[in-house]
């Protein structure tokens, strides 16, 4: 049982299927896919990478002053805007100009925001690269004197993984704890857990947490084998196929999700309306270099989170799984879920938008938070026939929510599994 109750008072997201809760849920409910081909490619292109971009998101519509965008990579833009949207949803006044109206003191407000190791935009280094060319060959001796003059002095600040949390914190004058977990797909959930620890030990009243990722960048796409991507042939909207007998790989996307969490006592005192309670959490790691034991890691993260929550699996409405859509990962995750949760219904959103890197967990968690309010959860997209090596109760038809709590889990390719238990308030 958690020593101090931690509640969620606001959340929001940016995803390939919608900007904000309303667009996202409508697309999820209607079975919309956000997956297409890389911008700039045509049917005649030699290679047409599948990606899940967020075409309806334009930072200039949200970031003020706009000049700040110059030092924000796509990852930072996504994370910053999602966080500000979540803060607004929570009714949290963080006005720097009118400190007397603030909902929380700067020293009692912190930011823990997960982020990937960001990939640069190739166009930003093009001039620098060509500055070292001579007679069709690259002269490395010219990199220092010639190329560096072609790079913006603040270029590096666009790609440091701590910058999403930095920009969010500066905008709110948050002077409390700040960190940037860089843990692949578990980054968002790890951020929520760390933020909860900070509140529980009395070092903050309110924390903004979540994650952001842009895996649709060509630099990430060039490492397709490392990320077990689906082949770039056929209909891009037919993949990923989580837990399906015909699954062939995942798809890289971009997105961000953010939550405002606070102690229940503080939230009620400021007149906020709690949406859900963080009941428990657990992180587990498979033995080094033994990914076949990933199932054990998944099982231990779920059972550990339930134990901390003081709940049984019978009280859980559904498991919001990782469901990457790859042959190996899905089978291992399914084995762990089966061992820990039996026939508990299983949902994943990756059939709609692929993997969003460090933004994955918070965006997917938002789906379950909305579902708990709506009372229904749509079927897992692209899962037409549950695979024999995934013996779990995948939601293949509309699911009616009958219980007040769910478990969200994510894993990494290095054997780490993270789980949180969330209960509707």
Regions found by a protein language model. Name each.
Residues 79-92, 161-172, 178-213, 251-272, ...:
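Active-site-proximal alpha-helical scaffold in enzymes
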Residues 5-9, 32, 36-37, 235-311, ...:
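Condensing-enzyme catalytic core mediating Claisen C-C bond formation in acyl metabolism
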Residues 8, 29-177, 213-221, 313-329:
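Conserved beta-ketoacyl condensing-enzyme motif
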Residues 1-68, 90, 265-277, 366-381, ...:
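ACP-dependent fatty acid/polyketide chain-elongation machinery
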Residues 37, 204-248, 281-295, 321-330, ...:
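Acyl-CoA/ACP chain-elongation machinery
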Residues 22-25, 118-137, 199-200, 221-234, ...:
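A glycine- and small-aliphatic-rich helix-loop capping segment at beta-alpha/alpha-beta transitions
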Residues 13-16, 66-84, 128, 152-157, ...:
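Active-site pocket-shaping loop/turn-to-helix segments
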Residues 133-152, 193, 197-201, 214-268, ...:
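Glycine-/small-residue-rich "gating" segment that lines the acyl/pantetheine channel
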